[in-house]
Amino acid sequence: MIDDGNVLLAFGLTLFAGLATGVGSAIAFFARRTDTRFLAVALGFSAGVMIYVSFVEIFRKAYEVLATQTTEVLASWYTVAAFFSGALLIAVIDKLVPGYENPHEMHTVEEMDMGRAALPQDTKHDFVRLKRAGVLAAVAIGIHNFPEGLAAFSAALSDPALGVAIAVAIAIHNIPEGMAVSVPIYYATGDRRKAFLYSFLSGVSEPIGALVGYVVLRPFFTPMVFGLLFASVAGIMVYISLDQLLPSAEEYGEHHLCILGVFSGMGVMALSLLLFL
């Protein structure tokens, strides 16, 4: 079921996806304005890739694996249950992270400067409060990226070509997420470099999630467990797409740009799957 030769590749892809938060941080550090039209298309593209591959490839593959271990009826029930369990997991995590500390609440480069300018510079209490908020933001994105790392890792472990596509989609998703984390960190410190560093390092939780998941689950990595994990990965990615990527794409740009990105992502994913038939 699992080719150990794929482990390093899977881990490398997950590391690439996680550290893409640093790209978002760099944008917040160097850019003078946010290209919202590009972000709208990019986020829509990422959502299109995730939704298409989840329903067309991952969900089907999870069912096929489970069907080899039990009856077709039970395999269908297990696949559906694991799919919604994955969605529920990421929904609970999202619910537990409040308002501004949530890295899925999108912000822009311009907002960093406006927000900092509005802060009272000589209030020690506000400085402490904002520093605490910045730390919370770093912790929040770490929590969010943990299951995403496991998703990218498990996909690459099963099928390297599929893993590459998912890692790229998650990396695109992590770019504006890194920008969002940089905002409260910058509020707390007034230091763009520190905002970049904190946000960049918070992405490390993605490969850590992959590593922990692999170490913990490896002794139990039977076909049944793998099938359940794969179905839950599909649920996680569909939830991220519908709850976070698509609304953010709409917020950043025009509706038609978002839809263009979605179908472009689906088309690229469909073509890549056809080429590997």
From Swiss-Prot:
Single GO molecular function: zinc ion transmembrane transporter activity
Residue runs in coiled coils: none
InterPro entries: ZIP, Zn_transptr_ZupT
Keyword DNA-binding in record: no
Keywords (A to Z) from UniProt: Cell inner membrane, Cell membrane, Ion transport, Iron, Membrane, Metal-binding, Plasmid, Transmembrane, Transmembrane helix, Transport, Zinc, Zinc transport
Localization of this protein: Cell inner membrane
Membrane-spanning parts: 7-27, 38-58, 73-93, 133-155, 165-187, 196-216, 220-240, 257-277
Protein residues bound to Zn(2+): 148, 173, 177
Residues that bind Fe(2+): 145, 148, 174, 177, 206
Bilayer topology annotation: Multi-pass membrane protein
HAMAP family cross-referenced by the UniProt entry: ZupT
Known role: Mediates zinc uptake. May also transport other divalent cations.
Identification of the protein by name: Zinc transporter ZupT
Gene: zupT
